[in-house]
Amino acid sequence: MQPTPFSSLSSADGCWTGLRLAQGLFIPDVAVPDDALSCVVVQGGTVRWVGPVAAVPPAFAALPRHAGGGALATPGLVDCHTHLVYGGHRANEFAMRLAGASYEEVARAGGGIVSSVKATRAASEDELFAQALPRLQALLDEGVCAIEIKSGYGLALEHERKQLRAARRLGEACGVTVRTTFLGAHALPPEYAGRSQDYIDLVCREMLPALAEEGLVDAVDVFCERIAFSLAETEQVFQAAQALGLPVKLHAEQLSDMDGARLAARYGALSCDHIEHLSAEGIAAMKAAGTVAVLLPGAYYTLRDTHLPPIQALREAGVPMAVSTDHNPGTSPALSLRLMANMACTLFRLTVPEALAGITTHAARALGLQDTHGLIAAGRPADFVLWPFAEAAELAYWFGHQPPQAIVRQGRVVQR
C-alpha cells in the first residue's frame, strides 16, 4: 500500500510509519532500539499501538500507511498558562520598563492589569474572540494541542463571563483542547479601590458560583502578591472553589515570598506558577501535594528579572516542572512555546529533557490532563506532531520560524 501525502489527509487513522521517537521522554513502556524507526497506529482518532515498524501487529496491516520519512514525533505541545483573551495591548508599558519602571511602578501608575481591564470591558465577546483567534492560531501552528486560557481582565461578572465564553468558543472553532481558568482575583478593579474584602466577597459569593453553574470554569486561580491579594484573601477564594469541586492553582511567589505555595499545596493545587521567590518550605509542600511548578521565562525576560526560580532545589525534590508562554499583553506577549523552552534552558538552566517534558508531560499534569495529553501512548487521543529534526534537542535549540511537518490534533490531520 502506497503512503498517503499528509496534505491530502483529514482523518489521522492509519499506520504512521518511519518515525523517530525520543525514548524515555515521550513514550512510556515502549522499547524501541535506538537505530530503529517506529510506528504510531491510529484508529477512530485514538492511538492504538506504538512500537518498532518491524513489529506492527498483523491486525493493523490493512490500515492506510502514512510515511514519516524519519521525522521526529512528539506529543502535541501543551501551553498550560495563558491569558490569551483580552482587549487591546500594552506596548506603551514596554517603553516605561525600558526607562526603568518596575512591574509594581507600572501598576501603580495605572498601567498593568488594570489597563487591560479597561480595554477588555470595552470590547464585546465577539471582538474578544476575533482578537484572540490569531494569537491562538500562532500557537497551534507551532504544534500546541492543548492550552489553558484564563479570565482575569474583566473583574466583573459580565466581563469575566465574556472572556470565558470567548475561550470556550476558541476551542470549538479551532478543534483544540481548551481548559478555562477563572482568575477573577487577578487585580482589584478601580471601583473597589480600598475595598479588597468586598471584592473578594463578590468573587466568592457571586462571580465564581454563577460562572461555574454555566459550565465555564475548569479551574480557579488567584494572583497572591503584595500588589494583588493577600494570603487570607487567596484562601477565601480557594475555599469557594473547593466547595464547588473545582481544582485550584496559584500565581505564587513571583515578586516576593508570600508563602502562597504552601497554601496552594494544602488545597491540592494543580500548579504554582512563576515561583521565582519560592522557599524551601514551599517546595516541600508542593512535592507532598503533587503540585506542578510552572516556569514562565517569558515574563522573567520581559521584566528583566534577576531572581531565578530555585531550579536545582525543585529538581532535587522531584517536583515536576512545566514551562509555559504566560501569554499576556503586558509582561509576556509571547506566541512561541518552543521559544519558552529555549529560554527555560538558557535562562533557568533546565536540561533539554526537562524543558521538553515541561511543554508536554508536566504541562498536561498542570492542567489535570495527564491521562489524555502530553504522551504518545496506546489508548490516548491522537495528538502528536512531526518535526523536521534529527534529534529531540533541536526542539529547544532552534528558535524562530521552524514549522512542524505535520500536526495531528484530536485525531485529525491539521491542514495549514
From Swiss-Prot:
GO terms for molecular function: imidazolonepropionase activity; iron ion binding; zinc ion binding. It is found in: Cytoplasm. The keyword Zinc applies. Its cofactor is Zn(2+); Fe(3+). It comes from the Bacteria. Zn(2+) binds at residues 81, 83, 251, 326. GO terms for biological process: L-histidine catabolic process to glutamate and formamide; L-histidine catabolic process to glutamate and formate. Binds 1 zinc or iron ion per subunit. It holds the Pfam family Amidohydro_1. This is Imidazolonepropionase. The gene is hutI.
